[in-house]
């Protein structure tokens, strides 16, 4: 067993002083070690009154400016996932529904120069049920049924059916399908005896073992709940009015537990950013026995520690850029011809800091292509099917509308879909690049693009969901 490390008392006093000094720089915040993307909540509070710069040394951490404030992530700002679609604004016929996302992060802006905390909305049409409920009507009441008992007073019932007319589309008839009333047989019922509750057990001489006696405890009950009637005669209570049992097997007397001393301080739990140091104690002074109560309070306690070292941030790929023009070196005229060219696209690795991991994969892609930009080919084009209805725009403004489209689709030439570039390396796929000129029969007065618009109905208001929480 190794001896515990002796920490000089002066060093401990210095550490406690540093932890209690107020943070400098920006206003202090509540610092958390985890940001939960699925709920936009802060998890695992590290400490209060921490400076924003110290808390965000680790980009995986999060902070709140006040107890009831929004949770904000320390990472570079980016949009949260879209929320689930809210319930439809009406329960039948056509309505609308909203969803949202929030710019989450610190030290920058999301796309479109949106500041952290900004909400962005989407609105779409919805239809929970095509038709609305229609109420039905009741039939006439059936005759009353027989009385439920053969003596004394009971009840009888009668029924009716919801079919005059029948309800439609989930509707119903108002009122009840069955009703009851009292009935009297004019016959007296016998009263059968029933036991009242058992009385309490008599006291044993001791509540825990170790005494000189093994006492017996007894209890009794009476046939009085109710007593049996005499005319007409009722049945007596079955069974016995008394019972007894031995008090043997009483437990040993309990011993309550007590805390031992706090153990030594552990190292800081992290090597970068903010972490914790822990102390522990055991409930062994004495150990609880024979049902005695366990020690109250916590067996661990934590203090915040600051490594003052920023945590690595791995790089992340930006989206691929657009493909370059399809060309072929030393050959200028390949447009509209079955001549294979090449094009490239690139992407940028952003956000890498403090010796974080580089982005995996390549930053450039090359593919083979045919240049068909603004080309006219022999066959006429054809109109596409209607696209799905788009989102309602504006989602939070007045009179939002939705649009669907049909486009004139140009016919593509029957060029070879593959090409052999280097002998022994097999065939490579060839992609069409550019937009050929489309020539379609005129449709509703349009030659290229046909659009249909509709208003969005029963539009709900855009409200921050976090402001609706109690």
UniProtKB/Swiss-Prot annotation:
Compartments where located: Secreted
Segments for region (Interaction with Complement C3 beta chain): 350-358
Domain TSP type-1: 27-75, 76-133, 135-190, 192-254, 256-312, 314-376, 380-463
One of the GO BP terms on file: complement activation, alternative pathway
Glycosylation: residue positions: 82, 85, 138, 141, 144, 150, 195, 198, 201, 207, 259, 262, 271, 320, 323, 383, 386, 389, 429
GO cellular component: extracellular region
Quaternary organization: In plasma, properdin exists as dimers, trimers or tetramers in the relative proportions of 26:54:20. Interacts with the pro-C3-convertase enzyme complex (C3b-Bb) comprised of Complement C3 beta chain (C3b) and the Complement factor B Bb fragment (Bb), where it binds (via its TSP type-1 5 domain) with C3b and Bb. This interaction stabilizes the complex and allows it to become the active C3-convertase enzyme complex (C3b-Bb-FP). Interacts with C3b. Interacts with CFB.
Family annotation (PANTHER family): PROPERDIN
Name of the protein in question: Properdin
Gene source species: Cavia porcellus (Guinea pig)
Gene expressing this chain: CFP
């Amino acid at each position: 067993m190794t001896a515990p490390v002796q920490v000089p008392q002066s060093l401990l006093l210095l550490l406690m002083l540093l932890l209690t000094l107020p943070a400098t720089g920006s206003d202090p915040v509540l610092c958390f070690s985890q940001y939960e993307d699925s709920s936009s909540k802060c998890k695992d509070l590290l400490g209060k009154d921490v400076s924003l710069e110290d808390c965000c040394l680790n980009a995986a951490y999060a902070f709140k400016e006040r107890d009831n404030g929004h949770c904000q992530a320390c990472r570079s700002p980016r949009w949260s996932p879209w929320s689930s679609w809210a319930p439809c604004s009406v329960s039948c016929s056509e309505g609308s529904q909203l969803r949202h996302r929030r710019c989450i992060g610190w030290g920058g802006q999301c796309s479109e120069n949106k500041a952290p905390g900004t909400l962005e909305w989407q609105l779409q049409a919805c239809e929970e049920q095509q038709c609305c409920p229609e109420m039905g009507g009741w039939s006439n009441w059936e005759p009353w049924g027989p009385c439920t008992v053969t003596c004394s007073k009971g009840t009888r019932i009668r029924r009716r059916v919801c079919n005059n007319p029948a309800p439609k589309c989930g509707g119903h008839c108002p009122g009840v399908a069955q009703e009851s009333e009292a009935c009297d047989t004019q016959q007296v019922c016998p009263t059968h005896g029933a036991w009242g509750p058992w009385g309490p057990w008599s006291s044993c001489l001791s509540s825990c073992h170790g005494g000189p006696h093994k006492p017996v405890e007894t209890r009794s009950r009476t046939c009085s709940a109710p007593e049996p009637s005499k005319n007409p005669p009722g049945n007596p209570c079955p069974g016995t009015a008394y019972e007894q049992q031995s008090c043997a097997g009483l437990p040993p007397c309990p011993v309550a537990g007590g805390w031992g001393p706090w153990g030594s301080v552990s190292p800081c739990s992290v090597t970068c950013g903010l972490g914790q140091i822990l102390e522990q104690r055991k409930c062994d002074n004495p150990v609880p026995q024979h049902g005695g109560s366990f020690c109250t309070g916590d067996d661990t306690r934590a203090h915040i520690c600051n490594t003052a070292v920023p945590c690595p941030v791995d790089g992340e790929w930006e989206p691929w850029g657009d493909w370059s023009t399809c060309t072929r070196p030393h050959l200028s005229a390949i447009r509209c011809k079955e001549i294979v060219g090449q094009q490239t696209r690139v992407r940028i690795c952003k956000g890498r800091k403090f010796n974080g991991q580089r982005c995996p994969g390549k930053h450039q892609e090359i593919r083979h292509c045919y240049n068909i930009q603004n080309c006219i080919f022999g066959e006429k084009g054809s109109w596409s099917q209607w696209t799905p209805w788009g989102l309602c725009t504006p989602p939070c403004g007045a009179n939002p509308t939705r649009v669907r489209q049909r486009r004139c689709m140009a016919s593509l030439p029957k060029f070879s879909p593959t090409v052999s570039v280097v002998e022994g390396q097999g065939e490579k796929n060839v992609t069409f690049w550019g937009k050929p000129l489309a020539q379609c029969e005129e449709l509703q007065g349009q030659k290229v693009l046909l659009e249909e618009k509709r208003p969005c109905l029963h539009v709900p208001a855009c409200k921050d969901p976090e402001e609706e929480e109690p």
